[in-house]
């Protein structure tokens, strides 16, 4: 059975089992979110390539708007996991309460700003006369309902940190199932529902998010939970400056990391948009396909954060390292399987979205690059997650800034414009970024300094 077989039979077989047991719900959750995004694009593609491109234009500004909350979520997961290992339930719930108050206030302010300035934001992202109005409509609806998404993400991050990955899986699977069903009913109009096109896709997404938000809130009402609303009320736990400072200390560098990453991603998206509507549509589907592989890494990353945080809180650094290595090994096996699927099924995947042969050919060329991207992507996502979960967020921020903001952008420009390779050249920038992050993360993980960080 090789290395993994020896692990299962040797000293760490119990740890490997715990990793898999905690990881599989997180993997299912992340995969289903990515799969729902792929289905969303598939249904939108029935409106034409312009619609796929329009929705694609909103992706990076939306994620840039959520960068602040992504950073906060990393802090929440890392701190709750560490407090779980330290067996400090009160401190963990204090972290959650403080974070939720902050999330509600910040999300309301962000939502108003993005809705008000939707048109110039989308124009900045490279919209054309064909895609602008649809993209603005979609963006306004999505960002108008972002508060529900932010609350859901905050609570789910805390639950993952506590090791409750099955709770977050149920929440997101339900939310995205509703999204898919409403997409079918509202995009083209079925069973008497109005055909709302792009607007229908946005409304479906927000409705699913509202349901997910309610389910997340209900998850902290269980009396036996480590994160427990009853416990919070009984002990009169309130937001504190100390908890806020802890969140900021862990999250500030993640925030800058997210901002610089989103700038890099947005630059790539703008370059892709300038290749034309058809190339942008093929690019967007390629990003959705790549998100499927990211989902596996993200699921294993969630498990690694919880297990590593708990191990470090319990003063077991060697166990923390072993959890990280085990997650990476499982991820490498998954990457090999995905490479085979993309290699032999890439053309078929693109034919689901487009009838135009020239767009399919563009997509097949993109798939050939994605095959190499996946190999580095899953492993770097896991190792980066391990480092963030331990609180080594400054290193991950610098590594991501160098890789995404600079290497990705420069190589994309050289490939797409200087060498004249078009959209495929831009994807070489994506590959260079993933390789760079993989190298940075692997070096840092193997140095082992991250296990000594206190949060």
Question: Which residues are covered by each model-predicted region?
Answer:
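Short alpha-helical transmembrane segments in multi-pass integral membrane proteins
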Residues: 1-26, 80-146, 195-252, 308-373, ...
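Transmembrane alpha-helix boundary and packing residues in multipass membrane permease domains
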Residues: 26, 30, 41-42, 78, ...
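Hydrophobic transmembrane alpha-helices of multi-pass small-molecule transporters
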Residues: 64-67, 179-183, 213-217, 292-295, ...
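Residue-level hotspots within the lipid-embedded alpha helices of multi-pass solute transporters
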Residues: 30-31, 67, 107, 111, ...
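Small-residue-rich hydrophobic transmembrane alpha-helices
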Residues: 52-112, 149-168, 280-346, 377-401, ...
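Helix-loop-helix hairpin linking two adjacent transmembrane segments in secondary transporters
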Residues: 148, 156-159, 168-216
């Amino acid at each position: 059975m090789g290395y993994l077989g020896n692990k299962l039979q040797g000293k760490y077989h119990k740890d490997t089992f715990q990793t898999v047991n905690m990881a599989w719900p997180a993997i299912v959750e992340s995969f289903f979110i990515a799969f729902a995004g792929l289905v969303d694009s598939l249904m939108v593609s029935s409106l034409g390539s312009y619609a796929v491109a329009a929705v694609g234009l909103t992706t990076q500004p939306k994620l840039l708007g959520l960068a602040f909350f992504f950073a906060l979520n990393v802090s929440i997961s890392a701190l709750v996991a560490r407090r779980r290992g330290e067996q400090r339930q009160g401190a963990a719930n204090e972290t959650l309460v403080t974070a939720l108050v902050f999330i509600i206030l910040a999300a309301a302010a962000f939502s108003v700003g993005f809705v008000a300035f939707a048109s110039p934001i989308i124009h900045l992202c490279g919209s054309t006369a064909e895609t602008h109005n649809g993209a603005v409509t979609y963006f306004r609806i999505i960002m108008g309902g972002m508060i529900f998404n932010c609350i859901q993400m905050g609570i789910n991050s805390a639950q993952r940190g506590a090791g409750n990955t099955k709770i977050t899986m149920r929440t997101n699977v339900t939310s995205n199932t509703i999204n898919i069903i409403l997409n079918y009913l509202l995009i083209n109009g079925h069973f008497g529902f109005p055909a709302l096109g792009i607007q229908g896709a946005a409304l479906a997404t927000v409705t699913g998010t509202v349901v997910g938000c309610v389910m997340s809130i209900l998850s902290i009402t269980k009396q036996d939970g480590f994160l427990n609303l009853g416990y919070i009320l009984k002990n009169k736990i309130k937001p504190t400056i100390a908890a806020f400072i802890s969140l900021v200390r862990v999250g500030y560098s993640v925030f800058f990391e997210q901002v610089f990453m989103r700038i890099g991603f947005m630059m790539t998206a703008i370059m892709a948009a300038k290749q034309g509507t058809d190339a942008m549509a093929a690019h967007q589907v390629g990003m959705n396909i790549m998100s499927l592989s990211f989902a596996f890494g993200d699921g294993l990353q969630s498990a690694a954060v919880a297990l590593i945080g708990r191990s470090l809180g319990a003063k077991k650094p060697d166990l923390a390292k072993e959890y990280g290595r085990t997650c990476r090994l499982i991820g490498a096996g998954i990457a090999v399987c995905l490479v085979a699927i993309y290699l032999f099924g890439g053309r078929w995947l693109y034919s689901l979205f487009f009838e135009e042969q020239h767009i399919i050919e563009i997509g097949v060329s993109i798939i050939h690059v994605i095959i190499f991207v996946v190999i580095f992507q899953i492993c770097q996502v896991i190792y980066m997650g391990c480092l963030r979960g331990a609180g080594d967020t400054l290193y991950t921020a610098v590594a991501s800034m160098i890789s995404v903001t600079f290497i990705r952008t420069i190589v994309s420009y050289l490939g797409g414009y200087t060498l004249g390779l078009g959209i495929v050249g831009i994807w070489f920038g994506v590959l260079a970024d993933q390789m760079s992050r993989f190298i940075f993360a692997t070096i840092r993980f193997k140095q082992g300094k991250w296990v000594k960080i206190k949060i």
